[in-house]
């Protein structure tokens, strides 16, 4: 059963994370900072609506949880949707600045392209679908992580969550990276058109949750053991392959990988 202190802790983390969050690096830094601060609030807030013992809470405790959940859905979900929607424009700006080949989102041809490629969904419908999928992955990851301290099989939970994250990243996007150009962005892969670039940005949003998080706050959770690298790419780099079975008591810093989508996740003693 969740006691009053635990509910209060969720609320404290919510505001704590919003205060401490650092803005992600972006050409639209102001918007990215606002988005990252709200997005990081998901870390504990997403779990608030998913606690199995919520029915056992007192009326006051339920009211607190529901209030947090309502704010989470109304404020943060809206920010997620708007960011994904606006990333259309960001995608075109990036492509235009770097001289990449792209298809304009405003061209009539884009509708035919979307219908041919995505079964009749318009650009907005596609973005909405991806946003919903993104929300689901975040909720599943965090709800399970919070609940995992009460289970005896941490590995099984995290493995299942990693599968969901990988499925979200890999399908049905099928983003094809090509070797980076030294004249444009040395050391980074890039997509071949504006639509693919949009999905790359969405992938970066997912990874940003983990890369920009206040990981130190997890050390205060009971039974915390350390950090482990989760390989979420079909073709991970050798660094992540070597690191995936190691547990670090201090958070290791993952380098930026052009073709490797890997994250860190907390491990708890069973």
PLM region spans:
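N-terminal leader/targeting and assembly helices and adjacent pre-domain segments
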Residues: 1-192, 205, 270
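Acidic, glycine-rich two-metal-ion catalytic cores of nucleic acid-processing enzymes
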Residues: 178, 182, 186-270
């Amino acid at each position: 059963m969740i006691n009053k202190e635990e509910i209060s802790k969720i609320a404290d983390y919510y505001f704590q994370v919003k205060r401490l969050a650092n803005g992600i690096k972006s050409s639209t830094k102001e918007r990215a900072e606002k988005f990252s601060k709200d997005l990081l609030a998901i870390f504990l807030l997403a779990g608030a609506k998913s606690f199995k013992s919520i029915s056992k809470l007192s009326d006051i405790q339920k009211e607190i949880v529901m209030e947090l959940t309502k704010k989470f859905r109304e404020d943060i979900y809206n920010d997620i949707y708007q960011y994904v929607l606006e990333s259309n424009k960001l995608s075109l700006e990036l492509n235009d600045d770097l001289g990449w080949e792209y298809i304009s989102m405003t061209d009539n041809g884009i509708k035919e392209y979307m219908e041919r490629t995505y079964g009749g969904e318009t650009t907005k419908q596609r973005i909405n679908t991806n946003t919903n999928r993104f929300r689901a992955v975040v909720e599943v990851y965090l709800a399970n992580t919070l609940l995992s301290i009460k289970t005896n099989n941490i590995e099984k939970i995290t493995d299942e969550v990693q599968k969901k994250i990988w499925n979200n990243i890999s399908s049905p996007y099928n983003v094809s990276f090509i070797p980076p150009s030294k004249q444009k962005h040395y050391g980074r892969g890039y997509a071949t058109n504006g639509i693919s670039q949009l999905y790359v940005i969405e992938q970066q949003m997912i990874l940003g949750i983990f890369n920009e998080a206040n990981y130190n706050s997890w050390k205060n959770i009971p039974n915390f053991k350390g950090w482990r690298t989760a390989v979420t790419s079909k073709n991970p780099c050798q660094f992540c392959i070597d690191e995936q079975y190691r547990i670090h008591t201090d958070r290791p810093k993952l380098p930026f990988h052009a073709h490797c989508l890997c994250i860190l996740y907390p491990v708890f003693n069973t």
